Amino acid sequence: MIGYLNLVYAGLHEPPSSWTIIPPDFTISRHVEVLLSVDSTIYIVDNLENIDQRISRGPFTHLAASPNGKGLALLSYSGLLWVVSTDFQRSLAEFNTKEVVGVDGPVRQIQWCANDAVIVSWDGLVLLVGPFGDTLQSVLFIAHFVRGLKLSYRYFYSGSTFAITELDGVRIIGPDVCDFVQKVPGTYHRR
């Protein structure tokens, strides 16, 4: 017999455009919560109830929960990256991905870089969006990020990438490299 999670029926008549999971350790209900992008809103579904968050900013092509379960990154069909608290009460950052010069094709992936920033990736380009919408574009090397400055460096990978969120950063795997991006530790800021 195959085990499965019994979720409350969310009233879906078609598949969600995107979804993500928040583990039970990070939810008030202490149940696994699945966030579903349906039409212009987000449903939070667990094994007891489903709650329409009544958000009118969707639909969203990509959803990603931060490793600590406190933040969400949502990418709309219009290309707006919206970073918000998981209770949808605090907007942390907004960034229009359509304004990135040199991007070819749709966004392939969004992932968190620890709990501090979000990675947006296209074929051959990775963009790091910081807590206030600051950006750092990279491929092979991530420069020292100084708080308060808007940095924009452009480096390209030789092909598609895949990003994996980790507790202290994000691993970016390309055709010929594996990079690890993390926040510069506080001890380096004082030098």
Residue spans for each PLM region:
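Intrinsically disordered, low-complexity regions in large eukaryotic scaffold subunits
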Residues: I2-R191
